[in-house]
Amino acid sequence: MAQGDDNKQAIGQIIRQEQALIFPSLDENDAFSLGQRIRDIAVKDKLGIAIDISLWGRRLFFAATAGATADNTEWLRRKFNVVRRFHVSTYRLVLEQNREDRMFAPYKALDVADYALAGGGFPIRVSGAGVIGAVIVSGLPQREDHNLVVRAVAEHVGQDPVALALPAA
């Protein structure tokens, strides 16, 4: 199958993820539980990552595991800005933009210092409220960052993570 076809299938699956992974509500306890779930997976699998769960105006959870770097924290900020701007998964945008330079097209006027075209950011969509924040992971290859977030969010909201997972690249 051609790369373009693979991307189209992955984009379709990510859209399904975004439509299925709706939180009934989200408060500080939910954010802590979700963040701890991601951290537990990372520690068990020895993944060096940074994790951020934030609403538009307020951080609810942050953690880093052994192996994460200061750069990962900066990537969290830049991925968060992308989710805040577009209200969709950052990996979906990576596949839709399909740019080797990993920068947004110039007409979008998004400074690379503030916006990262990289997977690992996922919108927090609350039933009846819409997108209110983002769950972000940084430290793995971008598809793996995305998959880790989707797995944890799916488990948290009672969806089947296997049914929602992207196929191996």
Swiss-Prot record:
Gene3D superfamilies: Haem-degrading domain (3.30.450.150)
InterPro entries to which the protein is assigned, alphabetical: PduO/GlcC-like, PduO/GlcC-like_sf, YBR137W-like
Pfam short name (any one): HbpS-like
Disulfide-bonded cysteines: none
PANTHER family given in the database record: PTHR28255, UPF0303 PROTEIN YBR137W
Similarity field: Belongs to the UPF0303 family.
Designated name of the protein: UPF0303 protein BMEI0598
Organism, as annotated: Brucella melitensis biotype 1 (strain ATCC 23456 / CCUG 17765 / NCTC 10094 / 16M)
Taxonomic path: Bacteria, Pseudomonadati, Pseudomonadota, Alphaproteobacteria, Hyphomicrobiales
